[in-house]
Amino acid sequence: VTVTRTWGSSPRPPGSLMAINGRGETVGSVSGGCIEDDLIRRVQGEGLDAVCAQGRPATLRYGISADQAHRFGLPCGGTVELVLEPVAAHSLLPELLQANLERRSTQRRLDLRSGAVTLHEGRRDGLPELSDHALVTHFGPRHRLIVIGAGDLSRFLSQMALGLNFEVIVC
């Protein structure tokens, strides 16, 4: 599941990711919890085939009405758009993980009609790009901060950098 766009206030920014397995176990987050709960119910109740017809990606919007925004815990009338994608061998996740381990920036293009995925060299980060036919996401290594010395200042600097999703190395 990928957050592709948001309108108004949203708990998670575009590009946020979450995975759900058939047992309802999750990794990642796309909201403050209520949307995750609904997605888990859909996957477990209807099954992934019902959510993603014929194994193809599906687009969902939460918060279209004020009642729905309140029900799913979206602050201030926010709206969140998600793309749900069934994971299979053609998802190229091992290749994407390997590129990340090798600190290579990668662009992942998901064809929304067929579910086909292609990987290309890309930039480190960026917002997802959604069209009628494709979702393009950008993955890359985290920014790295190398801190020389292990005093109090280094500790505070490292904590701030970790909070900003930096990879921190203290020498």
Which positions does each model-derived feature cover?
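Segments forming oxygen-rich coordination pockets for charged ligands
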Residues: V1-C171
